[in-house]
Amino acid sequence: MSEPKEEFNKHNYSADSIQALEGMEHVRMRPSMYIGDVGVRGLHHLVYEVVDNSIDEALAGHCNNITVIINEDNSITTEDDGRGIPVDLHKKEGVSALEVVMTKIGAGGKFDKDSYKVSGGLHGVGVSCVNALSDHLKATVYRNGEIWEQEYERGKALYPVKKVGDTDKRGTIVTFKPDASIFTQTLEYSYDTLASRLRELAYLNKGITVHLIDKRHVKEDGEFEGETFHSEEGLKEFITYLDATREPLMKDVIAFEGEKNGVPVEVAMVYNTSYAENLHSYVNNINTHEGGTHLSGFRRGLTHTLKKYADESGLLDKLKFDIAGDDFREGLTAIVSVKVQEPQFEGQTKTKLGNREVSASVSQAVSEMLTDYLEEHPDDAKTIIQKVILAAQARHAAQKARDMVQRKTVMSIGGLPGKLSDCSEQDPTKCEVFLVEGDSAGGTAKQGRDRAFQAILPLRGKILNVEKAMTHKVFENEEIKNIFTALGVTIGTEEDSKALNLSKLRYHKVVIMCDADIDGSHIATLILTFFFRYMKELIENGHIYIATPPLYLVKRGAKKRYAWSDQERDAIIAEFGDGAKIQRYKGLGEMNAEQLWDTTMNPEFRTMRLVQIDNGTEADRIFSMLMGDEVPPRREFIEKNAVYANIDA
């Protein structure tokens, strides 16, 4: 390899900055230890690991543009205009620093504080892990006027790093194709999933520009499908995006950006007319959906500042009961983003920040920001406190309703809902319950099920839209009370009186089974909204499924076949030839018990969709848009996403 030109600066990003921490031998054997899983999430996580390198360059002030391309063969190309990965000889390893970065787990400048003060990446395994799990990877570096490249197969270099030309560009290009022998579930990248994360990164790192290009799809104008994400105001714009479908209570988004006790803190918040609390927190661009010290600091700063203002203004004088911390957060959408040099992650999924020093930094930032805003906007301040008082009154009503749910749920088996047809199996891990719309479909499901391990809970019509309902109305609703009771779920644990208690969960599979039509989809969405807002842990723990009943039965003589789509139906008709008869199932009740078992309930042949939350922030926005009060955003979403949509004016 020819000797590369070297460039010197105070904190020189060179081979000496690269520290190799661990070998790669276990990555291919135990990929889930490194990227979480080898399903859809793990596949997309590969992209995030590579993009995180570019984001680190941006955080260090050396990168402005990042491009992600989904190629026609579902390989991925990422490109940035950062300094380029160092290519000079690594003294300890005896090969190019680029090869060290690409083939040693944990190798990278992010472990060297002079190169990167903070670094993204939850697993922190870096691009070498992506290399190990790729069938093929090519790295191209533009650095100091020269172009360098190296290719790899399944993590092993095919040849030494070599110079292939000169350039006036700078940056790094990585193209990789995930290994089909590891990612056996799918190799298909979701545009929406990648767009959601890249949009999030653009908001969290204002000023950088992120391009997403999908070469699998060409638009009518001949250009590839794609989007560009860029934000000049960062979290303020992020809040506006998330709350676009909610009615604001304030003129402006309250925002703070600065450093407190050595911790860079960004906060943005706004109140709206909804009854939900929507707090989103990030550490070094990682979505910490389990919360942590930064979120507890935010809550403490918010509660202390608002209560102090309300007391000093005499706005709480007539209140006959105490205000709780929750009351200050009803109808609040907020984002907390901190940058921490050495984050300590805890919790079930390692997404809970444990650094104690961060709490005081965030609390101080929120107190200063909020105090200034309340003094400058007295009308908004009064509106917020009035909202808090209403929330407190509703909380008292909701507590009574919650207690009713609690009492009803912890009763003996005789207290189960009358319409529940239970199963005989006592082991919850082997049991499943089908939530079925209507008594007629419920009757068919009861006849068709395997009584040993399948229970049926019929629901009466469309359940309450919890997105528009006050909390006490939710807990007073009979159908929702029946769901709590049937599932054995209660509210309150030893650690948290308001947390969901799943210790007595009676079924480990909860299956939403609705008609395969528009009404059925609406009912399924209402049920999903309830689970997302009030039983999110069931989704996060992989307990919620959606059944997929067939749309058609195609017959010709003695031959019959079910179809789950129009395309499948047409293919069967073409195969059967003339004389094929088609039956369209508008509802579950149109199938007899044997057909329902064969197509939708039999574990050997059925297809069920596991409900997962890929991006909690985006999921929150979409539920709010689909089920909230604002009609125009919902209409726009349907028109953009529906294959066909008959929307009443």
What name fits each language-model region?
Residues 60-62, 87-90, 446, 523:
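Conserved ATPase-coupling elements of RecA-like P-loop NTPase cores
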Residues 1-17, 24, 48, 56-58, ...:
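GHKL-family ATPase ATP-binding module
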Residues 85-107:
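Short conserved segment of the HATPase_c
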Residues 393-412, 427-432, 443, 447-449, ...:
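C-terminal interaction appendages of subunits in large macromolecular complexes
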Residues 56-57, 84-85, 518-519:
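Residues immediately C-terminal
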Residues 29-48:
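Conserved short strand/loop->alpha-helix "switch" segment adjacent to the catalytic nucleotide/phosphoryl-transfer site
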